[in-house]
Regions:
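A short, internal acetyl-CoA/4′-phosphopantetheine-binding micro-motif in the GNAT/acyltransferase core
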Residues: 88-95, 123-124
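Conserved N-terminal entry element of GNAT/NAT acetyltransferase domains
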Residues: 1-14
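C-terminal "cap" of GNAT-fold acetyltransferases
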Residues: 117-131, 135-137, 144-161
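Conserved acetyl-CoA pyrophosphate-binding loop and the N-cap/start of the following alpha-helix
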Residues: 94, 98-106
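A short helix-loop-beta-strand connector motif used in the catalytic cores of GNAT acetyltransferases and
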Residues: 45-61
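Conserved beta-strand in the GNAT
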Residues: 62, 68-76, 84, 89
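A conserved beta-turn-beta hairpin within the catalytic core of GNAT-like acetyltransferases
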Residues: 77-86, 95, 116-117, 149-153
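Conserved GNAT-fold acetyl-CoA-binding loop/helix
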Residues: 21-49
Length: 161
């Protein structure tokens, strides 16, 4: 299957939002997250959130097979060295086929090409499968924190060039 990763244009944001919602819905289901107990979870973000992030300069990328988008991620610059990876999402029916790794490798190359040397990410700490996947792809666990307003623990990982 031929794939390409391209920078997202504003008119493609609704398609990206569908990928994000469908992808993160599996996480919400697994951890019992709802709009009531976790209204800011990625599975519930509105289109206006993506539009605002784009306006603020967040780099957004879509993974396409033929003409169909099956993956999404974005990067924001924290400082001269570090970028944060946001919302890496692959549609459930395309998981476990190497597409997540393809996007992650693209993020690493993008950060290096921009002069960065570190990628940070926040995840649900209790998602051991996801945490182990990032560690297998070169990330190190740097800590965790429990916030009163979240029904899970936030976990933090980073990758260095």
């Amino acid at each position: 299957m031929k794939t390409s990763i391209i920078k997202v244009a504003k008119e493609k944001l609704p398609e990206c939002l569908e990928v994000i919602h469908r992808s993160f819905a599996t996480v919400a289901d697994e951890f019992g997250l709802t709009e009531e107990n976790c209204p800011k979870h990625t599975s519930f973000i509105p289109l206006s959130y993506l539009e605002t992030q784009m306006k603020w300069g967040r780099l957004m990328f879509g993974l396409y097979t033929d003409e169909r988008i099956i993956g999404y991620m974005s990067l924001s610059k924290e400082d001269d060295e570090a970028y944060e990876l946001h919302n890496l999402a692959i549609l459930p029916e395309f998981r476990h086929s190497g597409f997540g790794k393809q996007m992650l490798d693209y993020a690493k190359e993008t950060v290096k090409s921009l002069g960065g040397s570190k990628i940070k990410i926040g995840i649900i700490e209790e998602s051991t499968v996801l945490k182990d996947w990032y560690i297998a792809n070169g990330f190190e666990h740097t800590g965790s924190k429990k916030f009163d307003h979240l029904p899970f623990t936030s976990g933090y990982l980073e990758w260095r060039v």
